């Protein structure tokens, strides 16, 4: 049996050559550098179509794209030192000691342009949000910050991990607005087969006690390990007992054939007896060890 990094590289290349061939046959023009794909398109929609096709091709080999590195962007124009200098100047404070909406609009506009010019790197947006968080902003400014960042997070999914700390909790966003965002994020992520986005939608739903009206278990059995686990925690919280049973049966099947890839999903939802075939894991379960924070179990 061949083992080792060289064998892994060979197998990866064999798989990706097949993926390349199918993408070329579909009419896409791209370059692959080891496992990084670069595709130049004329429109945003064509770029989205390429990403969807790549996701589907990789899925057929039980592989997935790295969502944090997946982005649609313009050519880079601005260096990091330049954007830090630009965003290091905070928006002007108005005569009443608060930052008014006009200044906030201009500041976030700069941050967005810099992000787009720097390979879609979320660092400028995160930096800008931190700066705004430290300022006394007007009510209109706060509403604009929240609405703008939530809108951007749908367009640029790599902003989603910032939302809990820098938007929802920082600005005490209303449950209705969070509910609306979760619904959009969930539906959009399902369409794009972005299971990281689905996982975040489920996490926000659990954390803020907001049920997703369009929740459908059928779409989630194809998700990755974390998506499956959060689906189970969501079903447990909101009393979807049939879906819970479906996921438990799914975990039992995965334990037989694909434990290593889905171990945390399998471990967390099966009991000690059901894990008996996995000695170490059964012992950990017997000791009450969990990898999930108690407030989310």
What are these regions (language model features)?
Residues 79-93:
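Short, low-order "capping/linker" segments at domain edges
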Residues 1-33, 38-53, 57, 61-63, ...:
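Conserved polymerase palm-domain catalytic core
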Residues 68-80:
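Short proline/glycine- and acidic-rich turn/helix-capping motifs at secondary-structure junctions
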